[in-house]
Swiss-Prot record:
Its main location: membrane. It holds the Pfam family ATP-synt_F. Keywords: Hydrogen ion transport, Ion transport, Membrane, Transport, Vacuole. It comes from Botryotinia fuckeliana (strain B05.10) (Noble rot fungus). This is V-type proton ATPase subunit F. It is found in: Vacuole membrane. Coiled coil: none annotated. The lineage of its organism: Eukaryota, Fungi, Dikarya, Ascomycota, Pezizomycotina.
Amino acid sequence: MAAPASAYKDRQFLAVIGDEDSVTGLLLAGIGHVTSPPDSQKNFLVVDNKTDNAAIEEAFERFTTERKDIGILLINQHIAERIRHRVDTYTAAFPALLEIPSKDHPYDPEKDSVLRRVRRLFGE
């Protein structure tokens, strides 16, 4: 059953949690957005080896729960692995969660939480 229009009508932005190259490319493509003051929240998080998993989880929570203007959340698959317990338990329709490859880490369909759910659904 489709979600009511009220669930998605204000969700007009993408958010990204990724490495520097992925985030930079998406920002150059025009997805960057900062909310109005006083909180001025960005719709992206650049993750490197020094980024704590807690910071990644906090951004994931903010983009999926707190921000009602995010329609799609893109996350590098190798970063999703760092918070796999949160990604695997995420079931909301909005924002849609998509795992994407990065320059240094190719996409592995065996790790993708959405594809695993589809396989379970079809009994594979």
